UniProtKB/Swiss-Prot annotation:
Organism per entry: Psychrobacter cryohalolentis (strain ATCC BAA-1226 / DSM 17306 / VKM B-2378 / K5)
HAMAP family attached to this UniProt entry: HisA
InterPro entries hit by this protein: Aldolase_TIM, His_biosynth, HisA_bact_arch, Isoase_HisA-like, Isoase_HisA-like_bact, RibuloseP-bd_barrel
Gene from which the chain derives: hisA
CC terms in the record's Gene Ontology section: cytoplasm
Record's protein name: 1-(5-phosphoribosyl)-5-[(5-phosphoribosylamino)methylideneamino] imidazole-4-carboxamide isomerase
Organism taxonomic ancestry: Bacteria, Pseudomonadati, Pseudomonadota, Gammaproteobacteria, Moraxellales
């Protein structure tokens, strides 16, 4: 378990651009940059120790759409840990991304539909697999958040506790992109019950959220932030220094 969470900037890719959605709605997007590689460079310059990439088109279409952009970012920052989700539905895609230089691959919808696939991926790519759990009111959502299932997020997390998953990215859909604050209770509860390190996502707005999450460094490995750093309500460098205790 990680004692000091890292701030992880999100770079969400849609139609070749860096965007942010509200509550996962593809039609409700804000374009922040036409150059995702330049945006990645900005966050690295500001002190990012890890990047979170999402192929939004891939998540909805079920196949990778932004391979070239992802490869370009990985090539530009070969020593930086990079995690990616969206459109990962088979072993070939995982292999291609890891070969391209990505550190972690996030399996979301496929993890719900075929848990055995996660176990197989962990065997083939040990230490590189993250499960992405997106939830609304504690219930798992799939296919780019289009479908809400009857599976509890905590129950899904427990399924992967012993198969070699590196961590879980937990996103509270209701708060994602809404700047309403992170759901600390559900995030910590998932980590405690699931038995895996969790990367918090959805709702991070300002330093107050970072302060609320810091005490749970024993189970929260990272904090993904998107709109807050893009709109300036959270300073990436300041937040990381605070978590570092400096």
């Amino acid at each position: 378990m990680c004692a000091v969470p890292v701030i992880i900037p999100a770079i969400d890719l849609k139609d070749g651009k860096c965007v942010r959605l509200k509550q996962g709605r593809m039609e409700d997007d804000t374009v922040f940059s036409d150059d995702p590689v330049a945006m990645a460079a900005r966050w690295v310059k500001e002190g990012a120790r890890r990047l979170h990439l999402v192929d939004l088109n891939g998540a909805f279409d079920g196949i990778p759409v932004h391979k070239q952009v992802v490869h370009d970012i990985a090539k530009a920052f070969p020593k930086l840990p990079i995690q990616l989700g969206g459109g990962v539905r088979n072993m070939q895609t995982i292999e291609q991304y890891i070969t391209a230089g990505l550190t972690y691959i996030i399996i979301g919808t496929k993890a719900v539909e075929d848990p055995d696939f996660v176990a197989e991926a962990c065997r083939e790519f040990a230490g590189h697999i993250i499960v992405g759990i997106d939830a609304k009111d504690g219930m798992v959502a799939t296919h780019g958040w289009a479908n809400v299932t009857d599976t509890k997020a905590t129950e899904l997390a427990k399924r992967f506790a012993d198969v070699g998953v590196s961590s879980i990215v937990y996103t509270d859909i209701a708060r994602d992109g809404m700047m309403q604050g992170v759901n600390v209770e559900q995030t910590v509860n998932l980590a405690r019950e699931g038995g895996l390190p969790v990367i918090a996502s959805g709702g991070v707005t300002d330093m107050k959220d970072i302060e609320l999450l810091k005490p749970y460094g024993d189970c929260i490995e990272g904090i993904i932030t998107g709109r807050a750093i893009y709109e300036g309500t959270l300073d990436l460098g300041e937040a990381q220094l605070y978590l570092d205790g400096k």
